């Protein structure tokens, strides 16, 4: 059993409830790295951000860099695969505008919004995974058959996580049948990530999902470098995914821990840049 499967099974031994629903976006400005007015870096940064705005909605993902070291500005933006091109464009424009207002003199900053994320830096970070900040959206409807729901969801998510690292687009989707219902899911990584970076990012956000949304009939977990979504209805994806193989039949390969649904612990979501929202 690999570390991802083990992490899932350990997390499923605890089911958490939550009520905090405040955070809607995350912005981080690295105040330790600043530029001065009149220097060349802000010129390169403005060119980088303008390029991201111009190109992001075409494929839902864009990178850009301008300048020479040590004044090179690197930028990356990624839209959620299920948002329209118009929503993607609007989100990236909003992200740039808010970052320019909130981080007016920083050489490194990022913003995490519902429909997109954007980061810029004076260092090349394109292949580095970052899931340190996360937002979770959870459907208010709870699964009527918790044990069965957890089993089917776990099998589906494991299958997608194994498939996405082999996909050039770093985007896959699939579905799994559960009694009279079907769970539809997708996972997405930043295309520039290495296999290990994508895998580690997904492991982190799935573990996070299992602390708050694994009994809800729908969830979106968003981070800078990877996303996950599952619903009880087909997902309409604007940007083309790679279909994942159907998950294997439920068996003892991924057994639920004994008594996994017998105890409910109450905890508040963490306040270090992570939160859950009811949708």
Model-derived segments and spans:
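Extracellular secretory-pathway ectodomains and N-terminal mature segments of eukaryotic proteins
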Residues: 1-279
């Amino acid at each position: 059993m690999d570390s991802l499967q083990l992490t899932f099974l350990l997390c499923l031994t605890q089911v958490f409830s939550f009520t905090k629903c405040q955070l809607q976006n995350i912005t981080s400005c690295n105040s330790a790295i600043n530029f001065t007015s009149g220097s060349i870096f802000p010129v390169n940064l403005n060119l980088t951000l303008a390029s991201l705005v111009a190109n992001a909605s075409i494929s839902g993902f864009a990178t850009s860099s301008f300048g020479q070291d040590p004044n090179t500005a690197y930028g990356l933006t990624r839209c959620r695969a299920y948002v329209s091109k118009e929503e993607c464009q609007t989100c990236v424009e909003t992200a740039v505008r808010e970052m320019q207002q909130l981080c007016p003199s920083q050489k490194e900053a990022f913003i995490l919004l519902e429909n997109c994320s954007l980061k810029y830096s004076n260092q090349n970070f394109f292949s580095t995974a970052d899931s340190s900040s996360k937002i979770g959206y959870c459907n208010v409807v709870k699964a009527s058959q918790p044990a069965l729901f957890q089993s089917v969801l776990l099998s589906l998510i494991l299958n997608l996580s194994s498939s996405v690292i082999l996909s050039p687009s770093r985007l896959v989707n699939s579905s799994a049948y559960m009694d009279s219902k079907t769970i539809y899911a997708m996972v997405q990584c930043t295309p520039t990530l290495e296999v290990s970076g994508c895998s580690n990012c997904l492991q982190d956000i799935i573990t996070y999902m299992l602390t708050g949304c694994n009994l809800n009939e729908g969830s979106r977990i968003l981070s800078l470098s990877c996303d996950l979504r599952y619903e009880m209805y087909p997902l309409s994806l604007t940007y083309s995914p790679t279909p994942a193989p159907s998950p294997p039949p439920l068996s003892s390969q991924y057994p639920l821990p004994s008594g996994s649904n017998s105890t409910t612990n109450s905890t508040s979501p963490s306040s270090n840049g992570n939160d859950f929202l009811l949708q």
